[in-house]
């Protein structure tokens, strides 16, 4: 460990027995909360951005999926660098890049400048979404690991819900309804969180847990494992579902006669509904039942999308709640399956996590883009919603291939 880097001395005991692991978990939660706030912050601002920058739905769909595209490239090497640099420096750098991506959107003057600023998020994002499970794998074991995965994952949904609720209700009025100043405000907050992480986070001082094999050899070995291949396919479909629907959800609700503020409130329902399930399900679903749970959640996700698109009133809100419970739990469930695959473990979780998010974000990119294109072609969101339902049924099919 380089001089000046904070580290946990393993001679004092195993990290999973140290009380400081809960401080690390709290900091991971905070980073993931601002990760969620950053990428959800565009959705409630789609209407003023479309008007101000004179963009089409297809262009906005490309913008919404652009950071996933850069994420794909960055995540191929992010896991390797996290293992090399340590989690403290890696996650600080990732959060700093996210802060720049959000804050610099203030200067966008059209599609050509807005697109790369949003895409920049995908450079920093992998450090967070890959670094968090890597940290959990190092600092937690047993049932505590499932609990920790559930807890830190709620951060993203809390941050996303905060963006959807507060943007039009509180932040836009404070900034004289300037979407530019709103992004600048969120960027400054994210920068402050990055500095807090730098002060409090600790690296593990360990040569045993670091990657000792060449990256190419590790990837080849991992891809030969059937469970890992299944997780990769399900991850791709899951991210297409989550980003494809939730990125457009405020606009979908606005087209159903919701006011922008009310659409933001309603769009936060899936995120808030997902928080209890994230705290409960990852801990209590036994490893041998995760395949069954994956299939059930996929069916619930498909059903909920139909309720959201085709019904109104109470049943539509039931659909929003059901979607949050089902879709929000898919990623931590897949993460646990990956993390506890014997060929992965804590040793290779950085590389395996990079591979998972690299493949998954292909779906994260294509989901919003294809939904936006279907809106331009058909004039409504029903075709895009049917596409999301089909993806959920694909996960149901793949769940039969999860090995106990």
Spans of model-derived segments:
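Juxtamembrane intracellular "pre-TM" segments in multi-pass secondary transporters
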Residues: 8-18, 202-231
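Residue-level signature of mid-helix packing/kink "hotspots" within the transmembrane helices
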Residues: 40, 68-76, 161, 271-279, ...
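Extracytoplasmic gate region of multi-pass secondary transporters
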Residues: 42-44, 227-278
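Conserved MFS/SLC helix-loop-helix module at the cytosolic interface between two early adjacent transmembrane helices
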Residues: 73-110
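Cytoplasmic helix-loop-helix junction between adjacent transmembrane helices
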Residues: 117-155
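Helix-loop-helix hairpin linking two adjacent transmembrane segments in secondary transporters
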Residues: 151-201
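C-terminal transmembrane helical hairpin of 12-TM major facilitator-type secondary transporters
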Residues: 289-337
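A late C-terminal transmembrane helix in Major Facilitator Superfamily
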Residues: 344-380
């Amino acid at each position: 460990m380089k001089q000046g880097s904070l580290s946990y001395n393993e001679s004092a005991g195993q990290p999973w027995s140290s009380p400081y692991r809960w401080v690390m978990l709290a900091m991971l939660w905070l980073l993931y909360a601002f990760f969620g706030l950053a990428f959800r912050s565009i959705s409630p601002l789609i209407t003023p951005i479309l008007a101000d920058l004179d963009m089409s739905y297809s262009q906005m769909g490309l913008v919404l999926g652009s950071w996933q595209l850069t994420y794909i490239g960055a995540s191929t090497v992010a896991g390797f660098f996290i293992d090399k640099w340590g989690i403290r420096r890696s996650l600080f750098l990732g959060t700093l890049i996210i802060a720049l991506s959000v804050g610099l959107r203030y200067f966008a003057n059209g599609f050509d400048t807005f697109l790369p600023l949003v895409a920049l998020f995908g450079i920093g994002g992998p450090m967070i979404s890959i670094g968090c499970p890597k940290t959990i794998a190092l600092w937690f074991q047993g049932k505590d690991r499932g609990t920790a995965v559930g807890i830190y994952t709620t951060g993203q949904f809390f941050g996303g819900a905060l963006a959807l609720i507060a943007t039009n209700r509180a932040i836009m009025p404070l900034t004289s309804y300037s979407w530019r100043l709103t992004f600048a405000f969120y960027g400054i907050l994210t920068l402050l969180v990055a500095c807090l992480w730098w002060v409090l986070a600790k690296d593990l001082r360990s040569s045993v847990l670091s990657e000792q094999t060449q990256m190419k050899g590790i990837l080849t070995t991992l891809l030969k494992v059937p469970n890992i291949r299944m997780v990769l396919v399900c991850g791709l479909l899951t991210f297409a579902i989550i980003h494809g629907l939730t990125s457009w959800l405020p606009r979908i609700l606005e087209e159903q006669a919701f006011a922008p503020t009310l659409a933001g409130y309603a769009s936060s329902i899936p995120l808030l509904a997902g928080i209890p399930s994230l705290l409960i399900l990852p801990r209590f679903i036994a490893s041998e039942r995760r395949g069954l749970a994956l299939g059930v959640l996929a069916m619930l996700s498909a059903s909920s999308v139909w309720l959201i698109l085709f019904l109104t009133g109470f049943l539509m809100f039931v659909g929003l709640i059901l979607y949050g419970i089902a879709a929000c739990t898919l990623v931590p469930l897949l993460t646990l399956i990956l993390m506890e695959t014997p060929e992965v473990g804590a040793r290779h979780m950085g590389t395996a996590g990079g591979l998972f998010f690299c493949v998954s974000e292909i779906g994260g990119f294509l989901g919003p883009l294809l939904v936006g294109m279907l809106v331009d072609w058909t004039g409504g969101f029903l075709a895009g919603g049917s596409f999301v339902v089909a993806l959920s049924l694909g996960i149901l099919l793949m769940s039969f291939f999860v090995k106990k």
